[in-house]
Amino acid sequence: DVKFTSPITDHEASDNCGVEILGAEEKIFWKDRKGANINSIRTKKSIKDCDVIIVKFGEKFKQWNAAFDAGYAAALNKSMIVIHNDDHQHALKEVDGSAAAVASDQKQAFRILKYILEGSLK
């Protein structure tokens, strides 16, 4: 069985989950803290429960969360597939060093999973 989980990709929902659930905050710091704490519960559970983690470093945002998740997964000795383009190779060399595989795109990561699960290169 394969089950995929991911961070909440609705940026507004991710940012506002804390105040929506726990109540408003006057200061942005505490608003962000509430949301981050709730999101971290979900992320930690997903990483702890997984057999293989895929961490994608994209172009749109700074990738602090992806790097943090990769470090957490490495600390838990999870098998990790990292996805990033060549522009990030130098900056991510330590992350790449702890990964089982480094892919340049999602198609390559999918082929790795297919091979792991089915033994197929097709």
Q: What are the roles of these predicted feature ranges?
A:
Residues 1-122:
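Conserved catalytic or regulatory cores that recognize and/or transform ribose-phosphate-containing ligands
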